[in-house]
Amino acid sequence: MDFSPYAGRWVALTENNTVAGVGTTRDETRVAARAARPKERLRLAWVAIYPPYIPLPEWPLAELHNLLPKEGIWLAGGPVRDLLLSRNIHDWDFAVAEQGCALARKVANALRAAYYPLDNERDTGRVVVTDPHTHRPVMLDFAVLRGGTLEEDLRRRDFTINAMALTLKGVLIDPTGGQADLNARLIRMTNPSSFKDDPARLLRAVRQANALHFHLETRTEMALRAQALSITTVTAERIRDELLDMLRTVPAAHGLQALADVGLLSHVLPEIQALQAVKQSAPHYYANSQVHTLAAVSAVEGILVLLKGEARPSSTDTYVPTPNWAWERLAEALLPFQAALLKYLDEPVNAEMPRADLLKWGALFHDVGKTETRTVGNDGRTHFYGHAKSGAYSTETRLEALRFPGKAIAFITTLVAEHMRLATTYKEKLTRRAAYRFYRDAGEAGVAVVLLALADAMAVWGRNLTQPRWRALLRNAAALFRAYFERPTEIVAPPALLNGHDLIALGLEPGPQMGRTLEVLREAQAAGEITTREDAEKFVAATLTGAET
């Protein structure tokens, strides 16, 4: 959008960055905006008087105005790129001539926020503060210039679109042509040694191209392909973080395919690359297991979009050609559980790893076991007996190598190990006993397993998905959601009616049989066969009598 007509004035911006109000002061602008858009959440920005007339957000810049030095400080890197693209900014990077940590500490104290010294050697400090608009934590980083001047600092950065800076008055500094590359939608390295200086940039180039829907500039792509092997010199933690960000972008499947195309996937996720050679027969819509995997990732994204109430996916999706009626039936089935599912998926398994993120990783790895379990029957059809359990082991090994936290590994491997459960039981109406056994095995990952199973079914059947099959799958999925969200103490985790001491009092000898009896008892309770302590005692007595005879 062209903001030049508003140069030197305040504007109120909507979520999609359209102007809802204009004024010479903040208060005047707020009044005008509220009159025009009383129900919308708006953000204020001051439009710079210098080309390209960038709207500078009120928060945090106005908040920091009196705290920051008047000279020797610039907004730099990603935030400048995002301002030029009219994208929301989640983290703010400031380049300063001196005293980065001291300035960060000063800002943290003034905002009553948390301060962290990121890199004492390079004098870089971080402030973590809550954004008043989104109520989410935001990072403000203050880093001393690398090199003697701002221009030298910018030329050392990864890509031209990330090598721009902005004075606090809105003057753009662009020594490498980043604005032109933004307009051309190109990812271009700032200098020929960019990837050699930091091989993690190899992954970042593909990730940012996917996230921004940009293309790799020709020489940059050639250098990336030539140096792909050097990604193996990067620490596992940095590779993990880049891949986490890659999977968070939409569509993630396109980014993963791009990693394969440039020769990076085989080095960072060899199990996924290996699926390229694994062929599968009907009913799979895709004969190639890797393409099927990307379709499953796309289907998970479609489900997440559906739950958020955003644009409904269509049958024209690149990887998931599921009929439109299937998405409509899915939306209807998920609607009663929408709020509960969103809350469940937003909860973190580990710091900054919500279940929604790990669900995508489950989709990515769900079929890696097919590489080792593929067989061909006498009829010429391929089979993958035991691929879920085999895949869980391979997944655990890869995630450990990438230094994933233990809880995240357990969650993702459970998704892989259990992803076939819904598909193998869809022909029969789900019983309370079956629901209990499902959650006993899947634990807190159970709800995510159901969502993955639905995504997998869409990827398996594609346009060939039938209404009776889909109806049955959705029926059992809804039953599992109902058990977890509405009847947890009845079906998922019923409170024990008896304990080990009670069993001893009833005549059971201590030993392994005691644990088995308690589990049988709990399963019967979940099935609704026993509801009281008296029922439980009679059940145990009958069990003991049967054992004696």
Feature map (PLM): residue ranges:
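Catalytic cores of the polymerase beta-like nucleotidyltransferase superfamily
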Residues: 27-40, 45-549
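Short aromatic-glycine-(Arg/Gly/Cys) micro-motifs in beta-strand/loop hairpins
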Residues: 1-17
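A short, exposed loop/beta-hairpin motif centered on an aromatic-Gly-Thr core
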Residues: 16-25
